[in-house]
Curated annotation (Swiss-Prot):
The keyword Hydrolase applies. It comes from Haemophilus influenzae (strain 86-028NP). GO terms for biological process: methylglyoxal catabolic process to D-lactate via S-lactoyl-glutathione. Its cofactor is Zn(2+). It comes from the Bacteria. Monomer. GO terms for molecular function: hydroxyacylglutathione hydrolase activity; metal ion binding. Pathway: Secondary metabolite metabolism; methylglyoxal degradation; (R)-lactate from methylglyoxal: step 2/2. Zn(2+) 2 binds at residues 56-57, 125, 163. Zn(2+) 1 binds at residues 52, 54, 108, 125. Keywords: Hydrolase, Metal-binding, Zinc. Its EC number is 3.1.2.6. The lineage of its organism: Bacteria, Pseudomonadati, Pseudomonadota, Gammaproteobacteria, Pasteurellales. This is Hydroxyacylglutathione hydrolase. It catalyses: an S-(2-hydroxyacyl)glutathione + H2O = a 2-hydroxy carboxylate + glutathione + H(+).
Amino acid sequence: MLFALPALNDNYIWLYQRENLPLIIVDLPETDKLFAWLDKQNATIEAVLLTHEHEDHTQGVSAFKKRYPTVPIYGPQECEKKGATQVVNEGKILTAHYQIDVIPTGGHTKQHVSFLVDNHLFCGDALFSAGCGRVFTGNYAQMFDGLQRLNTLPDETIVCPAHEYTLGNLAFAETVLVEKSAVEKQRIFVETQRAENKPSLPTTLKLEREINPFLQAKTLEEFTALRKAKDIF
């Protein structure tokens, strides 16, 4: 089971469950909607994964810990001050039921990480559908290197970004990509989804390789120019 729970203005809390095992929760922007969903599902929780320190990903941590004090909360070093109980910057997490790969994807923040659970990539604000995160406390080289790491994953990888930014990203992609047919087709799909108040996500790495200009960038210089152009688009 994979579910994108809308939160705040345009965030998603991702919930992943293999068969009838306990849930994995990715990022905690808020808890009211999450607690209501968990109660309705009568769910048990294996772990929480935090991708980075920004408030719109962590401001629900305190309330979550009060309600679920024994659930481990994994995140990079920068998330320790936000309430993460287990620091992970790279490597593997082995829980009772899951093996989780931790992939460094800094740039948006210095220590941003992404998580690969089975074939599901939870990439926070590193990779979006048809886009990528802004560079804040990290740098362009970090962001480019992180996206290059993600770009080595298989086509069938299910990509689960943290924000509903797809339409705006597709609009930019149409202005910079030479081959636009896949972008135009995806834009029609996403417009239909959003008109029905449905998520445009998840996506796949196969599709992103066709519609995401940041994954097509071959050099740091090309990537940096694209990112700066998107910043003022």
